[in-house]
């Protein structure tokens, strides 16, 4: 059963790889941004609560995001595995997710019930990739600042997963197919 969390800095190819791996293993690629948008659009009870925060310009609280993720993972199409993209983003979110996930049943009690794919790519490559998108907000200084913020927020999260022996590091500085194959090899070792 494939249960993965994808980590990586902006431009590392998380979304691309998560989607390819999800298609290959026939499990849903679950993006927290998509979950949030669909809950708001469907006016679900969780979506209504989230919209209240969003309308005020506030961040949606971790607990609400956790509840949405938990609900999404209970969906029948996620029963045989899933790939989370963009969540958890912080140690607090990871700890809460871990607690919720572990409380869901005996199978989930072991820390190895899901793994974390961390795509590593050198900063200069990330900057070049992001600049090539030619988006208005993708200026080199802005990109480098975003990378610094990402590393500051994510390093404790990486250590959290390392301590639980859940972390799988993948060299993302390769062609898409090479990275996909490296992930598949690692996933095949753990499933």
Swiss-Prot record:
GO molecular function, one term: adenylate kinase activity
Name listed for the protein in its UniProt record: Adenylate kinase
Keyword hit for Cytoplasm: yes
Domain remarks in the Swiss-Prot or TrEMBL record: Consists of three domains, a large central CORE domain and two small peripheral domains, NMPbind and LID, which undergo movements during catalysis. The LID domain closes over the site of phosphoryl transfer upon ATP binding. Assembling and dissambling the active center during each catalytic cycle provides an effective means to prevent ATP hydrolysis.
Record organism: Trichodesmium erythraeum (strain IMS101)
CC annotations in GO: cytoplasm
Alphabetical keyword list: ATP-binding, Cytoplasm, Kinase, Nucleotide biosynthesis, Nucleotide-binding, Transferase
Cysteine-cysteine disulfides: none
Pathway assigned in UniProt: Purine metabolism; AMP biosynthesis via salvage pathway; AMP from ADP: step 1/1
Pfam families documented for this protein: ADK
Gene coding for it: adk
Entry-linked CDD domains: ADK
Region span, NMP: 31-60
Database matches in HAMAP family: Adenylate_kinase_Adk (MF_00235)
Ranges annotated as spanning the membrane: none
Role according to the record: Catalyzes the reversible transfer of the terminal phosphate group between ATP and AMP. Plays an important role in cellular energy homeostasis and in adenine nucleotide metabolism.
UniProt region (LID), positions on chain: 132-138
């Amino acid at each position: 059963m494939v249960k993965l969390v994808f980590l990586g800095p902006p431009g590392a190819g998380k979304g691309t790889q998560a989607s390819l791996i999800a298609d290959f293993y026939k499990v849903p690629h679950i993006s927290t941004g998509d979950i949030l948008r669909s809950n708001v659009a469907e006016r679900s009870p969780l979506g209504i609560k989230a919209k209240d925060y969003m309308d005020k310009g506030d961040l949606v609280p971790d607990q609400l995001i956790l509840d949405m993720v938990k609900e999404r993972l209970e969906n029948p199409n996620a029963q045989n595995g899933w790939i989370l993209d963009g969540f958890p983003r912080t140690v607090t979110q990871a700890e809460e997710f871990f607690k919720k996930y572990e409380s869901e049943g005996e199978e989930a009690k072991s820390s190895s019930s899901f793994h974390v794919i961390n795509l590593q790519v050198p900063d200069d490559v990330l900057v070049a990739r992001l600049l090539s998108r030619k988006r208005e907000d993708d200026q080199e200084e802005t990109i480098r600042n975003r990378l610094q913020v990402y590393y500051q927020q994510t390093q404790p999260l990486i250590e959290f997963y390392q301590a639980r022996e859940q972390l799988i590091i993948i060299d993302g500085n390769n062609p898409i197919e090479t990275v996909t194959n490296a992930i598949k090899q690692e996933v095949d070792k753990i499933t």
